[in-house]
Amino acid sequence: ITACLDPDGWKEPGPLPGISTK
């Protein structure tokens, strides 16, 4: 997983918003 600030990239739950598998 990578940090992603793009709301469209919010694919995985995590402790911070914007956690993405993109």
From Swiss-Prot:
Binds 1 zinc ion per subunit. It is an enzyme of class 4 (lyase). Pathway: Secondary metabolite metabolism; methylglyoxal degradation; (R)-lactate from methylglyoxal: step 1/2. It catalyses: (R)-S-lactoylglutathione = methylglyoxal + glutathione. The active site is at E12 (proton donor/acceptor). Coiled coil: none annotated. Residues 1-22 are annotated as: Disordered. The keyword Hydrolase does not apply. Its EC number is 4.4.1.5. One of its GO terms (molecular function) is metal ion binding. Its cofactor is Zn(2+). Keywords: Lyase, Metal-binding, Zinc. Belongs to the glyoxalase I family. On the 2D-gel the determined pI of this protein is: 5.7, its MW is: 35.1 kDa. This is Putative lactoylglutathione lyase. It comes from Pinus strobus. The lineage of its organism: Eukaryota, Viridiplantae, Streptophyta, Embryophyta, Tracheophyta.
